[in-house]
Amino acid sequence: MRFLKIIVVILFLSSCSTEEDEIILKLDEYDLEVISYFKEIALGFEFGSSSKITRKWCSDLKVYIGGESNSILNEELDKIITEISSLTTDNFNIEVVSDSSLSNYYIFFGSGDDYAELFPNSASYVQSNWGLFSLWYNSSNCLNRGHMYVDTYRTNITQAKHLLREEFTQSLGLARDSDKYLNSIFQSSWTETLSYTDLDKDLIRLLYHPKMSTGLD
């Protein structure tokens, strides 16, 4: 019931101009923390001029893994996908496909230069970023394609695993960073976090709850 309550409040606040203290539903401190962090992380993107509204995948996410073969990172991706799938309740599905033509999301393991050859629009970012993601969305604010990379030359395996989790999770539509919580996967400063905090999990649950729609601010 907690998440349904939070969803109702978010929907209320997004469509109502009255004062927040008129809300009848009582929220505890953690509920308010989740809502505040959700608004900070889920509205808009870190770069560009896109409006600060909710966006998420409205169809299945079909992942193709390219670049250099890396069994350790492949296994880590499987683990991350399993974790995400356990948190979503709106029929969102993630699968890894072996044919890039069937995919709508490309994960590249290798060097930044090789990634930039495949995706030239990312060329200006790879020198200063060991991990990177890009997303596109349609007129309904549903994410519909994207790509990311993990630089396996400038990172050790722990760092590479962290970047894979961070960039892939942000590609769900939780696309902004924050300096608020040190252990969060969305922490803006460099960390080597390899797991989600309870708060991180709740953000995924909220965005991929059946009551959460795109286009909310």
Give names to the regions the model predicted:
Residues E20-L32, F47-G48, S124-Q159, A175-D217:
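Metalloprotease/metallohydrolase-associated module, dominated by Zn2+-dependent proteases
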Residues I35-L43, D78, Y106, D200-Y208:
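Generic detector of well-ordered alpha-helical segments enriched in charged/polar residues
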Residues R2-V9:
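Sec-dependent signal peptide recognition
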Residues S17-S71, F133-S140:
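Disordered inhibitory propeptide/activation segment of secreted metzincin zinc metalloprotease zymogens
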Residues V9-I10, S50:
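Residue-level signal for mature regions of secreted extracellular proteins and peptides
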Residues M1-R2, S17:
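N-terminal hydrophobic targeting signals that begin at the initiator methionine
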Residues S71-Y181:
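Metzincin-family zinc-dependent endopeptidase catalytic domain
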Residues F12-S15:
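C-terminal motif of bacterial Sec signal peptides marking the signal peptidase cleavage site
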